């Protein structure tokens, strides 16, 4: 039985120590400790990858707020919304398999751009995942629920 893609990767980001800025990438390498070259690598493997949906950005835009991609702190931005998947659900992207480990909470730093953002994104910021199979993710890779 062949699997069908549910979406694709739109943007990839890493973060660096000493700054909250996100750096756009063309490819991410992941292992069991998280995203290589990311400041959160090997910090908390249960929360080593942050995945967000374009739907979060569209929601904020409906309120007239221009929020730049990467602002949610995501490593992976995709056009599929994984927020309603169960904990333990597995997602294959590129050669990597990740497992949903936690629903993302809202951080107060999101209010820096606009004070309404934390309230608007209460349940729609993203998901944390842990890496189950190391590999690479590139822009436009397909997303599969496995």
Residue ranges and their predicted role:
Residues 1-104, 136, 146:
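Electropositive, beta-rich accessory/interaction domains or terminal extensions
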Residues 21-24, 108-114:
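Short, solvent-exposed secondary-structure boundary/capping segments
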